[in-house]
Amino acid sequence: MTDRVTVGNLRVARALYDFITDEALAGTDLDPDSFWSGVDKVVTDLTPRNQELLARRDDLQAQIDKWHRQRAIGPHDADEYKQFLTEIGYLEPDPGDFTITTAGVDDEITTTAGPQLVVPVLNARFALNAANARWGSLYDALYGTDVISDEDGAEKGTSYNRVRGDKVIAYAREFLDGAAPLASGSYADATGFRIEDGQVQVELGDDQWVGLAGPDQFVGYTGELGSPQWSILLRNNGLHIEILIDPDSPVGSTDKAGVKDVVLESAVTTIMDFEDSVAAVDAEDKVLGYRNWLGLNRGDLSEEVSKGDKTFTRVLNPDRTYTTPDGSGELTLPGRSLLFVRNVGHLMTNDAITDAEGNEVFEGIQDALFTGLIAMHGLKESDANGPLRNSRTGSVYIVKPKMHGPAEVAYTVDLFSRVEDVLGLPQNTLKVGIMDEERRTTLNLKACIKAAADRVVFINTGFLDRTGDEIHTSMEAGPMIRKGAMKSQPWIKAYEDQNVDVGLATGFSGRAQIGKGMWAMTDLMADMVEQKIGQPKAGATTAWVPSPTAATLHAMHYHQVDVYAVHKELEGKQRASLDDLLTIPLAKELAWAPEEIREEVDNNCQSILGYVVRWIDAGVGCSKVPDIHDIALMEDRATLRISSQLLANWLRHGVITEEDVKTSLRRMAAVVDEQNAKDPDFKPMATDPDSSIAFQAAQELILAGGTQPSGYTEPILHRRRREYKASVAGA
């Protein structure tokens, strides 16, 4: 039984109450009693509206399901369908032209295009690594990944391989030629660096010194001039590059110019995630996340890290200080990524707080209140709050996921306004990032943005969740195409193009981020370097990466592409059509061979089991899960949603049977067990699937997938994780 504290109409779990009262409120000017009274009033006032919005989702879905069932025979009539969606209010009127007016936004969001990390906030080590990923070693990122091939004796091995190192150096030199070119010649021939009359000069041999083609790219240096250990700071497209020189270092001693590393400004922004990448089902889990968020904002989060036989304490990096080119002043740059926090959406409740009748309170309301409170510590430097700030403009950046349409965005805006009143913050301090990952938001994106025109700081596409909603919305329309074919569908390109077009049309360029989705293949960095440049070329000022290393590699793309120049080329264009956006990804004909159907079912069942077993048994919400071909993929609830919804759709339309699903799950459980055999804490599923809560959760996600709200996986996952935790506690 959870120990609770009575706060007006609310019953707050003791662990949460004590943390907020004793830790989160400390160092603010807020009175605890007044704060908790404000929490009570916000919950009481806004809960009915949240419930109404969820009821509206259900009502629209029921009408769409009925419409499709009535037209099960015969071809899909696109015009009739569009008219129907308009009549029921699913498609809303265009709000007309406008420009967003969000003010007080940090440069990292408004004018600096670069990578964005998303990291589970419940894991302190991951959170610290991500916050510190503002700067990353290009040499390390190249040496440790497949961007540098193993050919010609360049294998990684257990010790430094000079052949591989030379390949890294050559690659980095070529990158510098593109990002900060010399007036003549190439960095590949550099034998020395110096500063003369406030300008960088590079020796190309035989005492031939050349400057930069763009002298203004040199913005600072560290160390004493003439010292063997120093560095040069360059800037290109708003991002910084630091060339570290130390001829006595192991790498520098092998380099004819003494360069030991090239450091890139990498993860310009990071999302600390309370949503799809975490498994937070109760007060204990929520407090862990809130405490880490507090440490990040106060600047005192730390974690003991062991590597081999060494243990050290990881902390947040300080800011970086350089001498200006003429030697007369200082330039200070942020040492850490600018932090967003992603709250949960409008659907879920959490028993960290209940009302007087025992009903769980909406988790999104809790998150807004508590992450907003905690973020106050990141707005100022003081003895109580620590030496590090997050925002330098006094803003709090909250990503709000899984909103369906403008009314839900308007509700978020009103919720944030109420939170500001409770916290004593100026109106519009809490900024909102809108995830464009639900179909009704995509179709009404401009109206969604208008509802938050004075708070919005980003829009971001999320292909996997968006596909999950695409399938669920049209569950009754017929069987969908295979998962791998989704990316080639007309609605996908229209979706990605429209997000950029609408963002530009509403004034995002220079004011807010236009974001694109995650690279999920964590080990295939050569492919990422080749392909992910397409996102900035499409107008994205940021795109998601799965690791600090990936952030450094993806940062190269923003040196190769001037995104704000791309915006000028795209402004005024409307590349996406509503007809394409409304094209349902139905299979034209069921021409799959039995082995193709089995392959699709097995692929999805294996993916579901591999993710769910770690969610349920280990409380891990974001995993590097090997697929059926043993390729490591970054999985979170979004990938689970699309896999479970596709199989639920095929089950609904008779492409597969319930027995097909159960048979595949049992077969794939053995595969997942084998893939996790080296994990001493892993509990095998295949030996007794009926008693494995994780296996039963995976099966339920498919068999009951058609009836889950919007196809979301959270209700089943949360219930099953609580069941597992209770079974362990009672053992």
Swiss-Prot record:
GO biological process, one term: tricarboxylic acid cycle
Keyword tags: Cytoplasm, Glyoxylate bypass, Magnesium, Metal-binding, Oxidation, Transferase, Tricarboxylic acid cycle
GO cellular component: cytosol
Pathway the protein contributes to: Carbohydrate metabolism; glyoxylate cycle; (S)-malate from isocitrate: step 2/2
EC main group: transferase
Cofactor(s), names only, from the UniProt record: Mg(2+)
Binding site for glyoxylate: R342, E437, G462, F463, L464, D465
Binding-site residues, acetyl-CoA: V118, R125, F126, S277, R314, P546
Catalytic machinery residues: R342 (proton acceptor), D636 (proton donor)
Binding site for Mg(2+): E437, D465
Chain positions found as Cysteine sulfenic acid (-SOH): C622
E.C. numbers: 2.3.3.9
Entry annotated with the keyword Cytoplasm: yes
Keyword Transferase in annotation: yes
Catalytic activity entry: glyoxylate + acetyl-CoA + H2O = (S)-malate + CoA + H(+)
Subcellular location(s) per record: Cytoplasm
GO molecular function: magnesium ion binding; malate synthase activity
Similarity field: Belongs to the malate synthase family. GlcB subfamily.
Assembly: Monomer.
Its job: Involved in the glycolate utilization. Catalyzes the condensation and subsequent hydrolysis of acetyl-coenzyme A (acetyl-CoA) and glyoxylate to form malate and CoA.
The protein, known as: Malate synthase G
Organism in which the protein naturally occurs: Mycobacterium sp. (strain JLS)
Gene encoding the protein: glcB
